[in-house]
Amino acid sequence: MSKEKFERTKPHVNVGTIGHVDHGKTTLTAAITTVLSKHYGGAARAFDQIDNAPEEKARGITINTSHVEYDTPTRHYAHVDCPGHADYVKNMITGAAQMDGAILVVAATDGPMPQTREHILLGRQVGVPYIIVFLNKCDMVDDEELLELVEMEVRELLTQYDFPGDDTPIIRGSALKALEGEAEWEEKILELANALDSYIPEPERAIDQPFLLPIEDVFSISGRGTVVTGRVERGIIRTGDEVEIVGIKDTTKTTVTGVEMFRKLLDEGRAGENIGALLRGTKREEIERGQVLAKPGSITPHTDFVSEVYVLSKEEGGRHTPFFKGYRPQFYFRTTDVTGTIELPEGVEMVMPGDNVKMTVSLIHPIAMDQGLRFAIREGGRTVGAGVVASVIK
């Protein structure tokens, strides 16, 4: 049987379910695939198909994640659901499944719970741009006032973490009843799909973003000058473009006089391609791995930042012992390690393997970074943690 061709005709959007344990995230995921397949085509996925999520490795970290897909008339969605709380934490921090928006599931019978709060906070830290709320199990709550109270609590919680709580779409539904095919509750799933379509803007594709190439290697070619190689992270680079070399040393400007791929000259290099860029008037020793080539003014170098970090457990090959303030590991950004020191939040004395923690990092060299950049924490080449830049300090 030949594989079905992947249709690129519709915009592709990445979403996922987040929220407290047993509030119905996986049931909702099953309900979305079931109801949408009935109305718009596509494959329905049963609860147990989603719940026994396969193990994946992202940056050496074991994560259980289920990936499903579904369609609305205007979009194609890739949706990620995790069985356990720890999987969510790891997933969001490593960016294993980047989300353009999240569906926060809150049981109307419980209201917001500790993990509801933690997932919203994580969403803020790791840069999930939009959250839509599905108030689940509404079939079990007869009291309209109680529903309004829960809704108000959720809005306040979102506002507390800088999401627009007052304007967030909140859909009242019952994932289980929708899954069982009850028409009035199926309608709520269609309402949710509609909210996804209208509230989450179409994500900007990597190719439309400002050019950035992490430098992996530098060569000097006699008679031609200096060539840097790497995989274009975003944007497009064309022969004749002015670029900045950012990170580690002072930022300098240069012009790209040639772009090549597999030793062939090209007019341009695009996001996702491995290229070599020939730089005008730049000496081999002025550039090193770990710097980036970037569109002028699009990214700046920084040493100090706030991050959200997951520390690998012993079973994942991480440390066997906790670390304390003053810990000095290497932080691996894109292509290189930079030593840094850490500050722990007030009241946190130590961090155990398997924990996640907010920490402030100070690097010995500046690195080109902005919010959302992922990194690994390493000791002597061994990965012991994964993190994401939540905000830049200086």
Curated annotation (Swiss-Prot):
Cysteines paired by S-S bonds: none
Q: Where is this region: G4?
A: 136-139
Where do the annotations place GTP binding?
19-26, 81-85, 136-139
Tell me which UniProt keywords the record has, alphabetically.
Cytoplasm, Elongation factor, GTP-binding, Hydrolase, Magnesium, Metal-binding, Nucleotide-binding, Protein biosynthesis
Location of the region described as G1 in the Swiss-Prot/TrEMBL record: 19-26
Give the residue ranges for region: G2. Answer: 60-64
Residue ranges of domain tr-type G in the record: 10-204
Q: Which Pfam families has this protein been placed in?
A: GTP_EFTU, GTP_EFTU_D2, GTP_EFTU_D3
- EC number(s) in its UniProt entry? 3.6.5.3
Give the signal peptide, or none: none
**Region called G3, residue ranges:** 81-84
Quaternary structure (record): Monomer.
Name listed for the protein in its UniProt record: Elongation factor Tu
Q: Which organism is it from?
A: Actinobacillus succinogenes (strain ATCC 55618 / DSM 22257 / CCUG 43843 / 130Z)
Q: Give the source lineage, highest ranks first.
A: Bacteria, Pseudomonadati, Pseudomonadota, Gammaproteobacteria, Pasteurellales
